[in-house]
């Protein structure tokens, strides 16, 4: 008997077998998830782990963080870089006081939080059907559905976000989002993806049409600057 598995089921199954063991995985505390996601902005997972553990040990909840001085917060952030992130955490903690918001729009309103971080918190903490779209999700979904549009454009990001939000309805959005992250890190690589190891071969339109090496299309706009030239005549 052939058992049909959906894209979502295959991705979740792959994730359950291959997921990375991370200290901010499999937790439901929105505060801790928020801290981890802010730390992960512009910083690698490997670099974040020791800082996350130390930070959470000292500031285990919103109230503790809000009551700390910004100088102490900076001290526990020292070495991680991009200190504005620490400032944003501290300011937001003071605005929240002791209750983390539960609605997407309220999370998005926090200082330093964008659509990806807000969606990740809604998914990981509250298991709401939100796709967290970062570079990993853009790459995986662009290939899976052969989206031949520039992912550097907001309209393309919106298109992929809409597709992703439909993908997670009725499934464990946290496992799908985390699965996409780990899948992009291990299999669906930016260059030379390991298609021979991919459980989504039969569903991946890019693979079926031999476009996996050209997708996603990512053409960033180049700002044209006016250049001034000084022309001289060299007389020998």
Annotate each language-model stretch with its function.
Residues 3-4, 8-194, 200-209:
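Catalytic cores of DNA base-excision repair glycosylases
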